[in-house]
Amino acid sequence: MSMQDPIADMLTRIRNGQAANKVSVSMPSAKLKVAIAKTLKEEGYITDYAVADETKPVLEITLKYFQGQPVVETIQRVSRPGLRIYKSKDELPKVMGGLGVAIVSTSKGLMTDRTARQNGMGGEVICYVA
């Protein structure tokens, strides 16, 4: 069976892994998934990520906890294959009043909503993380 939305699958694996208090989660790797993992690490939502280059590349994400509680409270897919969501720089959402981040795909690559606003760019809103 083919996977219809690999990004939603990635976010679900992270959500389920933290609900089960797993140390890490692994999934098939792709450039966009690695870029999302890089952004999550830069924002402090995950500890680390690595790509194991076996016959099929595997992305391993090390989850982060604070005092036994998952750092990621909510992680939600916004734009999906059946309904793409694009926002201009003025329309980019502030997740939880600025406490969370929206990951945005722009012409300059993947970045947070704050960075996109600073660069005066809009794009496709991939997901919300808080």
From Swiss-Prot:
GO cellular component: ribonucleoprotein complex; ribosome
Entry keyword set: Ribonucleoprotein, Ribosomal protein, RNA-binding, rRNA-binding
Keyword RNA-binding set for record: yes
UniProt GO molecular function: rRNA binding; structural constituent of ribosome
A single GO BP: translation
Family, as annotated: Belongs to the universal ribosomal protein uS8 family.
Quaternary structure, from the entry: Part of the 30S ribosomal subunit. Contacts proteins S5 and S12.
Function field: One of the primary rRNA binding proteins, it binds directly to 16S rRNA central domain where it helps coordinate assembly of the platform of the 30S subunit.
The protein's name in its UniProt record: Small ribosomal subunit protein uS8
